[in-house]
């Protein structure tokens, strides 16, 4: 069903944002909320124009798939907020939860444009397999219409949370403080394996691949640059399968312009660093 993004809907979005901020802070559930947003959006197929950020993960058929183990808790948390703001679509709610999860843990502000439609059935779509390497990551992310720089930036989201044996057959956090959003994921990658910290095959692929590696080095060195890149890529992820309304509030338009400028800065820096190494 179409979402009418009028003034009242925008007010509901802001109230929803406040309630999500309070819930995520009080429950320490930022990692699982970020995972929910990613898994709902990550089913997108750019060629087929199917899947994406459409709230379909609320359906049992999708929620019960092996790669979504544990997310029923995040869906339940969101239901508490949905009960207060029934007009807000599930698709908007789940993506806003991911945005807020990053912000309340110290990460960058991510522009959010509401208006996503809810799916009426579960999506198909493969998500990353932690036992695979760089070619697997490229295949999945290119299916979504995302690029190498998006793969590396979004992988930095592993700075939040930990893997659980009962969900993924892996156990442990990626960083020393799994409730703080920073660039430590990349710092730890460059340090090599550390007792008690997790490095999956998909993580190590970022080091081994010659196109991924420069981004890892840059983000480990410059947290501000990582934050800018992450905000760009997270916004893209949150809008997979969604065409934002043409008429949006000026504040949102200004934020989007800022993201575009930041993207240019990141790309320029990568090229500059590469040219320096080539001299």
Swiss-Prot record:
Residues carrying the site annotation Transition state stabilizer: 35
Localization: Peroxisome membrane
Catalytic site positions: 39 (proton acceptor)
Manner of cofactor binding, per the entry note: Binds 1 heme b (iron(II)-protoporphyrin IX) group per subunit.
Region called Disordered, residue ranges: 111-134
Transmembrane segments: 251-271
Entry-linked InterPro entries: Ccp1-like, Haem_peroxidase, Haem_peroxidase_sf, Peroxidase_I, Peroxidases_AS, Peroxidases_heam-ligand_BS
Family to which the UniProt record says this protein belongs: Belongs to the peroxidase family. Ascorbate peroxidase subfamily.
Note: Binds one cation per subunit; probably K(+), but might also be Ca(2+).
Quaternary structure annotation from Swiss-Prot or TrEMBL: Interacts with AKR2A and AKR2B.
Name of the protein in its database record: L-ascorbate peroxidase 5, peroxisomal
Organismal lineage: Eukaryota, Viridiplantae, Streptophyta, Embryophyta, Tracheophyta
Gene: APX5
